C-alpha cells in the first residue's frame, strides 16, 4: 500500500460534524480534545470500526457467521486503511483462569521450558527422579559385587485393598511360582486368602539371580519382563552379599528402577513430563481439589455472624435469621441451658469455647433437646452438629440454584489447601529448575523474573542450555516488553480480572510488540492511564517502537508528554457533545499551541493553566484518621495519618501499594466499622483510629452505575424520579388517571412490553458477547404509544431522556428539584452526555463522575470521607480543572477527599500528600514521604517529588 495518508471524508458518527481529516500512515498520531468531544467516535467508532468491518466482510460466509458484523460507520469514505487492531480498556477478561502469564503467552513458554529441562524431585525425600533405560538399569546392577544374590521383583499391587484373585490366576498361567505378599515369600499355589478390606503389597519374583560375568542377556530379558508386568517399575532386592567383600550395599536393600520417572526411595513416580501437566487449564495438570483455580470457598464465621453486637435471639446468626423458626430457637435454648450461656446477650460477650461449639458442633458430647409440638414434647439426646457443618451439609445436598447462591453469601475465599494456591498437581510442582517450581516462578514480579532469567543460563548444564536457548529468548523478550510499559511490579500469576483498564491495555500492547506485525493500524485508548510520570517515557518509547516496525499508531490521549513526542496531533473540539465534533487543530505540539480556538493549545502554550493554590488547608483542629501496621499485599507494616478536612493525594509509582493501602485496607476497614454487616474483607492492619470524626466513607470508583440498558445517569442521580413526578402532575396525565408507574420503564403499564422498557432487544450470542439491537416496536423510545402522547413543552418523556444534560438544564430551569440534580452532572463535566444514556455505554471515568455528581447533590454532613481512585481517567486537562473545582468544593463543605492519583496537575493542588514507594511490587509498600506539595518536591528519594518540582514553579 503506497498511500501516505488514511483519508477520512464526511465522518458523521455520533457528534462528528461531517469532518475530513488526513492521518499520516506509519506515524505516531495522537487524537486529543475534551471528554466527549468526539475523539473515540473518530478513532474507534469510525476508523477502527470500518477497518474491522472490511476485514470481516472479506471472510467467507461460513467464517462470518461466527463473527459480529459491525454496522457501517456514518462516513462517506475512508481510503488508505490498513488492517486494524484496537487495544482499548474494556476487554479485560473476568475469567479466573486468565492470568498475566497466559495473556502474554509467557506461561506457555514456561510450561515448555519446564517440560524440556526441568528436573523432577521426590516430594517425599527431595531426591531427584530420573527415567532409565533397560541398559542403564543393567549397568547399575553390574556395579554390585560378583556373587551377590538378588531377586528381580515386579510390584503388581502397591497399597491397595482387595483379594486380587484374577491377578494371581493370570500370574499362574504365565508360569510364575513365587510371590512376596506383604513382606512374606509365598508359593503361588499355597497363597493364603487375602482380606479384601485391608491394603496389600504384592510383588512377583520374576527372577532369582546370582551375579557373575556369564549371565549374557538374562538380566536384560528379566528386567523387561518385570517392567512389562508392573507398568514400567521394578525392584531389585539384595538377598545375600558375598561375605569377603566390603560393599556400600546392604542385605535386604531394595533399589527401584523405572522406565518412567520414579523416586528410588519413596516410590513416588511421574507418568510423563509434558507441557500439559503444567497447565492449570488442563485436567492433566490442574489441582484436583480446586480444579486449577487456586482458591477454595469456605463458610466464614465473620459472614455467618456479621454483627457481634447483637444477640443470637435478635438474629446474630444470619443464615438462621432472627431465630423465627421454633425448631432453631428450641435447639439454641437447649444448647444455652447445657453450656450455661444466654442467647439474649451480645454475641461478642460469649466465651470463645461457646462460639467454637456453636460454629463447629459439640463433637461427641450429647445434649438434651426438647421440641414442643402442640400437646406433644419430644426429647432427643444427641450431639449438636454445629452451624458450619449444617450449612456444609445443606450446600452439598441441596439442588436449588437459588439456595446455593444464598449460601455462597456466607463463604469467603481462601488459598487452595491442596496446591497452596499454585493451581497445579503435585506431579507438576515437583519439577524444578534452579530449585524453583513453575508456580513459584509465576508468583515472582516481572522485574524479579527478568533478573532470575538473566542468571539462569549459568545454572543450566550444556545439554539443558542447548534445549532451552530459543525458549529463553522468547521469554526474555516478552519480559522486556512488559518492563518497558511500566508493568514490572505485576506477577505472571496475577488474575486478569484484577487488572485495571490501563494495566490490561498495556499488557496487550506488550503482546502486540512481541508479535512483530507490520503494516497494521493500532488504535489505543489512553495507554498512559494508571502510569506514573517516571514510567511514561518508557511507554512512549514502546509506542514509537511499534511505529518503527512499520505500523500506524493512533492514540486517543490527554497526556502532555505523549503529545510532545507524537509525530502528529489531531485536536477535536472545541467543546464536548454538540459543542464538539470538529477538527480544531492539526500538526505537531508546537503548531497546536498557536491555534486560538484549541483549548488543548491554550494549555500547551501556558495561556491557560491549573493554578497552584496560594495556601494549603491544615484540617479540622488536628483531627486525623490514623491507620497503623498495614501489611496487606506488599505493604511493609505501614503507618499513615490523614488530616481530616483536607484534600489529600496518595501518590507513588504503579504497583507501589497505593490501592492496597487506601482501598483494600483503609476503606474496607472503615466501612466494616461503620457498617458491620457489609461484606468486605479488609487487608491486615494493627489499629485504625479517628473514625469517630466521620459518619460516612464513600469509594467513588469506576465500576458501572448499572449493568442493563435501563440504568442511566437520570435514574442513578435521582433526577428521573422528579421528572416522572412532574409528568404525573400534567393535566393530560391526571385526566387519564396515570400514576407514577406509568412513566417507569421498570414496571408494566406505560413501558413497551416488547423490549420491557430497555429500548433495545438483547440477542444472546452464546459463546460471543450479547448483542443489543434497537426495538422495532417502540423504535428505541422505551414506552408505548399512549405514554408518549403525554407531553410537556411539546416533549414526551422519551424525548427528555434523549436530551443532553445541558439541554435538560435549560428545559427544566424553572423546576428546582430537577435542575439541582442536573446541574451537578454539568459541574463534573458531563454536560454533553444524554440523561437517558445507557449505563453500559458509559466509560469508567464517566461512571465515576456520575457517582460524584450524585454525592454532590446530597445534603452534606461535613463528616464524609470520599475516596477516589484515579478520577482523572479519560479527562482532558480542562475537564480536570472542573473536577478539581468540585472536589475542593466538597472539602470546603467540611468533608475529606482522598485521591489516588498520578496526574501532577491534581497532585500540585493537594493540601497533603502521602507518597508510597519507593518502587513497585516487593520494592514498594513503604511511605517515602508525607507533607505538602513543597515537602514532596524537596524529597530526593521521591520519584513523584522529582517530577512535581517543575509543576510548582
Swiss-Prot record:
Localization per record: Cytoplasm
Zinc finger (C4-type) stretch: 752-778
Entry-linked Pfam families: UvrA_DNA-bind, UvrA_inter
Residues engaged in binding ATP: 33-40, 652-659
UniProt domain ABC transporter: residue ranges: 320-599, 619-949
Gene Ontology CC terms, in alphabetical order: cytoplasm; excinuclease repair complex
Gene Ontology BP terms: nucleotide-excision repair; SOS response
Name of the protein in question: UvrABC system protein A
Species the sequence originates in: Rickettsia typhi (strain ATCC VR-144 / Wilmington)
Organism placement in taxonomy: Bacteria, Pseudomonadati, Pseudomonadota, Alphaproteobacteria, Rickettsiales
